[in-house]
Amino acid sequence: MLRAPSRFVRSWITAAVVGSVLAGCGSSSGEPASDKARPAAKTDVTVDPIKAATELTDTKGVKVSLKKEPERIVCLFALCDDILTELGIVPTATNSALLAHPDFLGEEKAKEVDVIPGGFIAPEVEAILSHKPDLVIGLGDTHGKLAPALKGATTFWAMQPETWEDSVGYLRDLAALTGRTAEGEKAEKTFRTKLAAAEKTPSGKTALIIYGSDENFGVATPESDVAASLFPKIADYPWKSRGVEGSYSLEEILAQDVDVLFVETLSFGDADGKLSQKLARNPLWSKIPAVRNGDVHEVNPEVWAKGRGTRSLGIVLDEATAALR
């Protein structure tokens, strides 16, 4: 019986992936997969004006204070890169491969952005500071430990996105701090409009997003996976977080009659095969309707698992709605 990893295992798995990391599996819930999520509220396409600021309390209650608009920003995880791209800003240095995606900078221009050595889990402080950043943005539960070493030399902002609403909030916050208010409002409007359009014609199909590098796969749940938080609006998505120790077996997934599967393969160094290919070794895999009908989609993990921002989520919506038709 194959089981998805716990939050601890997921954090360990994704921390080993070069470039970025998924957030953990989320808040506790002992409810079974058959418990349907509550109907998602309709997306409001109204965008409130963004006011430029040098000090603010972010969408998660963290206080951020700068002396002036930041010009040199170092990104330690992909949401930062996503937001900066939406705002028309290129990071001074990054720790993500997202910028190489054609809908971001593309491979050639992305090569011009310096990469912070040390990997996602342990970016080198000296390398970060060598870029003389005005602002360093990282993932709270991974990079928060860097705060003492960066204190006094730069401003460190720890983000912790769990839902698409969080990502929109961070977009607005960074737009305010950089003075790119018009760009922020435009990006938010574009995303909200796309999401509202997608939810007007939801699919009746049952969908599932899984992630991992081997048979110990994980299930992305709407409570704390940003891409998955979109799915209750556009499909039947009956997967809920089971907390730190929770997991889903392949038998449970089979029982849900999944029509469309989205697979995020998280590789360790050199690619050693797709997750869907590895799961195919289990005889239960072939019995899942999505597998049987050829509706398994290997997606780009840089966008689906790591991007988290409005540009990445727009791509997720485009790809997901096309597959769910």
Where do the language-model regions lie?
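Bacterial Sec-exported substrate-binding components of ABC uptake systems
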Residues: 2-79, 182-208, 267-277, 299, ...
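Short helix-initiation/N-cap motifs at beta->coil->alpha
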Residues: 59-61, 116-125, 242-249
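A short, structured surface patch at a secondary-structure boundary
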Residues: 72, 77-127, 131
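Alpha-helical, coiled-coil/dimerization segments enriched in small aliphatic residues
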Residues: 98, 218-246, 303
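Extracytoplasmic ligand-binding site segments that recognize negatively charged/polar headgroups
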Residues: 99-104, 143-145, 160-173, 206-228, ...
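Proline-aspartate-enriched helix->loop->beta-strand connector
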Residues: 125, 129-138, 155, 253, ...
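Extracytoplasmic substrate-binding proteins
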Residues: 145-214, 295, 303-325
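Structured C-terminal subdomain patch of bacterial secreted/periplasmic proteins
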Residues: 185, 260-325
